[in-house]
Amino acid sequence: MVIFMEKRWKCPKCGNTEFFEKEVAMTGTGLSKIFDIQHNEYIVITCKKCGYSEFYDKSIVKSKDNLMNILDIFFG
């Protein structure tokens, strides 16, 4: 689970604080799309109440070096 979101995430649509977390991979454009190479990885946070979803770049969220920068972006 994304630790910094565990207790702080709040759905911007309905205000609920409970969510599901999933990891997804997607293709890009050009050759990666043709050959179905899924090199774009994301963490998806989905509200348990209304289904609203937000995508976060996995390489940024999981990076220990950038964790404090991410916290600053989301929480000021």
UniProtKB/Swiss-Prot annotation:
Pfam families: Zn_ribbon_13. This is Uncharacterized protein MJ1230. InterPro entries: DUF2082_NA-bd_Znr. It comes from Methanocaldococcus jannaschii (strain ATCC 43067 / DSM 2661 / JAL-1 / JCM 10045 / NBRC 100440) (Methanococcus jannaschii).
